[in-house]
């Protein structure tokens, strides 16, 4: 319901409406923070104010050394137009002949 109203007002009207609503929410937040009494429990006695030590930070994990000498696929970055030609020639003797439909191909 609010979207058509905002669209009719244009950019300036929508911005003005958003700023007004933001002020309402800011006022609500300050009311909530003032209504809560700090430092007293429900019985009216002050809470134990023990000083807590800051949380201990875990020891930093040592970084693993970068070693690219153990990379197994050494030809990975050497692809070219002839990369698979030798494999294609080796496997060509194992290929089965393809059945023909009886018609000549369009290139003949």
Curated annotation (Swiss-Prot):
Family affiliation: Belongs to the complex I NDUFV3 subunit family.
Membrane topology annotation: Peripheral membrane protein
Cellular component aspect of the GO annotation: mitochondrial inner membrane; mitochondrion; respiratory chain complex I
Role noted for this protein: Accessory subunit of the mitochondrial membrane respiratory chain NADH dehydrogenase (Complex I), that is believed not to be involved in catalysis. Complex I functions in the transfer of electrons from NADH to the respiratory chain. The immediate electron acceptor for the enzyme is believed to be ubiquinone. May be the terminally assembled subunit of Complex I.
Keywords on record: Electron transport, Membrane, Mitochondrion, Mitochondrion inner membrane, Phosphoprotein, Respiratory chain, Transit peptide, Transport
Protein localization: Mitochondrion inner membrane
Subunit structure: Complex I is composed of 45 different subunits. This is a component of the flavoprotein-sulfur (FP) fragment of the enzyme.
The protein's name: NADH dehydrogenase [ubiquinone] flavoprotein 3, mitochondrial
GO terms of molecular function: NADH dehydrogenase (ubiquinone) activity; RNA binding
The keyword Mitochondrion is annotated on this UniProt entry: yes
Pfam family, one: NDUFV3
InterPro entries, per the entry: NDUFV3
GO biological process assignments: aerobic respiration; mitochondrial ATP synthesis coupled electron transport; mitochondrial electron transport, NADH to ubiquinone; proton motive force-driven mitochondrial ATP synthesis
Top-level taxon of origin: Eukaryota
Chain segment of the transit peptide: 1-34
Sequence segments annotated as region (Disordered): 33-72
């Amino acid at each position: 319901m609010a979207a058509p109203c905002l669209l009719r007002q244009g950019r300036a009207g929508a911005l003005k409406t958003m700023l007004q609503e933001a002020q309402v929410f800011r006022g609500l937040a300050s009311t909530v923070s003032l209504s809560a009494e700090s430092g007293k429990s429900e019985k009216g006695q002050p809470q134990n104010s023990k000083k807590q030590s800051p949380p201990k930070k875990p020891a930093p994990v040592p970084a693993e050394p970068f070693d690219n000498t153990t990379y197994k696929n050494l030809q990975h970055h050497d692809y070219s137009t002839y990369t698979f030609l030798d494999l294609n020639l080796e496997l060509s003797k194992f290929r089965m002949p393809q059945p023909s439909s009886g018609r000549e191909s369009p290139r003949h």
